[in-house]
Amino acid sequence: MEMQRLHLYQLGPRAYALSRKKEIFKRNFQDRMHRIHFAQTYSEACLPVVVNKHNSLIRRKLGKVDQQLQENKAVNLALAAPRLTHLLIRPGETFSFWHCVGECTAEKGYREGLTISGNHPSSSIGGGMCQMTNLIHWMVL
């Protein structure tokens, strides 16, 4: 019988935190090596043409999911939105949600919000960011 290899993140909470930091370091290193130029210019001036607009329901009743997670998601989205508002993405620049918003931590005011983990509803600090990133994805399409 072949033994299955354990990943670092499977060894417990501390190992998970270490694995997470390793992956962030790896991603940042790769970004630098590939000389990716991320959009980071903001402008208060309105652009002359509105290409797309969309309104999305923030608070939803989702089966047996604790409604407080929906309220916290609204708080999390309100914290992230100003980091994206008025961002200019010029030719040759790359948009990165995580470079603009950064890590969602309790220290920054983010709350425990709804997340999906292994096809099941769950919760974690900063939960709800997927709704914003999905909205951005659909607006770009």
How would you describe each model-predicted region?
Residues 2-141:
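Well-ordered beta-sheet/strand-loop patches within structured domains
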